[in-house]
């Protein structure tokens, strides 16, 4: 037994040395020139959640609530169904406030509402609701919580869409957020022209999911095509394409390429880097951080709480990060600080961390 133990120990040591040698040979370093991240960063892509506890009006579909994803989402939000039932949906935002207060790099975040789907006649489609987080709930809650801003969500098919845009602006909305794939929004629909012109009038940018979506039980990924954004861009809406369209394809071309093709033609088209360090999207990091068409167009966001999943880990970048960087990032408890450190170490430049605040006109 002693000889066997010694043999295993030597095998482990030999394997470890071989791995270190191979890592030394194949180590590539950051995707772009790495530099220390700045402090005072704004996360412009942060979700909250709820299912109506405390009279919030929020809802999730029965299919999603029965899914394994539901309990996982609550866990990575840092709460539970029992706690939300006891304290109300607003507890999710309270958890966010506490985490932001403890962050070294993040000063504030934009909390996103999520409107329900509406049909072409302007009627709410109850059986297609995946997740609904009302504007009134988010807009009022953030007024009393330090470090939180209001990201509205207004479906353009609503009969009161223009009035809802005005209410949102009057109540502090920073921008409008869409997830077309589950809300049933075709951005290219000509009947939305007045809606887009109202957004321009109110100086409300649009943060919209672009690319495929797989976090919900029902989705129409044809609505995530970047090319559908041409109409609002032509109307003058400033658009932030979430995730740089880093998932899916249309007509045999990856969505990210379809988005990049549009960048030279529309100076009002931007993108955020949320979820780019997820295992299923990280293959695009080199392209995103080095493509000239994205220079000055990228801004920082997390898609919180997805930064709290195993899909976002420094351990997946052994040939890009030093061992010291990996250990430091893995041992960082605050999810926002962990995300900032990871993206900075991989080569995300200072101006990306700073653009979200300057673009949205928010003082630090």
Language model feature labels by segment:
Residues 92-100, 157-167, 256:
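Short, acidic/polar
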Residues 24-30, 245-364:
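H/E-rich (His + Asp/Glu) clusters that bind or coordinate divalent metals
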Residues 58-60, 77-86, 118-130, 215-223, ...:
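Short, flexible/disordered intra-domain loops and linkers
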Residues 42-46, 109-111, 149-152, 176-178, ...:
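Hydrophobic faces of well-ordered beta-strands that scaffold small-molecule active sites
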Residues 47-52, 116-119, 156-160, 183, ...:
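Active-site environment of divalent metal-dependent phosphoester hydrolases
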Residues 12, 19-112, 118-129, 337-340, ...:
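An N-terminally biased module of ancient metal coordination in phosphate/nucleic-acid-related enzymes
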């Amino acid at each position: 037994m002693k000889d066997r133990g010694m043999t295993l120990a030597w095998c482990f040591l030999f394997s470890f040395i071989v791995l270190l040698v191979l890592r030394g040979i194949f180590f590539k370093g950051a995707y772009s020139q790495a530099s220390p991240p700045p402090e005072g960063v704004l996360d412009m892509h942060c979700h909250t959640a709820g299912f109506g506890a405390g009279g919030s009006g929020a809802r999730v579909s029965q299919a999603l609530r029965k899914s394994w994803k539901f309990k996982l989402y609550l866990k990575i939000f840092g709460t539970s169904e029992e706690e939300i039932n006891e304290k109300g949906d607003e507890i999710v935002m309270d958890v966010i406030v506490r985490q932001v207060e403890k962050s070294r790099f993040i000063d504030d975040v934009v909390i996103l509402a999520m409107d329900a789907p509406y049909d072409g006649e302007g009627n709410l489609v109850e059986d297609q609701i995946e997740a609904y987080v009302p504007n009134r709930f988010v807009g009022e809650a953030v007024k009393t919580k330090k470090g939180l801003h209001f990201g509205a969500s207004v479906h353009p098919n609503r009969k009161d869409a223009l009035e809802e845009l005005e209410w949102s602006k009057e109540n502090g909305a920073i921008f409008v957020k869409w997830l077309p794939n589950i809300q049933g929004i075709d951005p290219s629909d000509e009947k939305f022209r007045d809606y887009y012109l109202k957004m321009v009038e109110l100086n409300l940018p649009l943060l919209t999911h672009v690319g495929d979506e797989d976090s919900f039980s029902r989705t129409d990924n044809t609505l995530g095509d970047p090319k559908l954004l041409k109409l609002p861009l032509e109307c003058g809406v400033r658009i932030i394409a979430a995730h740089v369209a880093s998932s899916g394809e249309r007509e045999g071309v990856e969505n990210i390429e379809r988005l990049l093709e549009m960048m030279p033609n529309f100076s009002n088209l931007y993108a955020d880097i949320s979820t780019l360090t997820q295992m299923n999207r990280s293959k695009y990091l080199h392209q995103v951080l080095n493509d000239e068409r994205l220079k000055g167009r990228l801004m920082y966001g997390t898609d919180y709480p997805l930064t709290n999943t195993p899909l976002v880990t420094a351990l997946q970048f052994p040939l890009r990060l030093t061992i010291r960087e990996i250990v430091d990032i893995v041992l960082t408890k605050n999810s926002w600080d962990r995300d900032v450190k990871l993206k900075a170490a991989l080569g995300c430049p200072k101006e990306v961390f700073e653009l979200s605040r300057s673009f949205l006109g928010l003082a630090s």
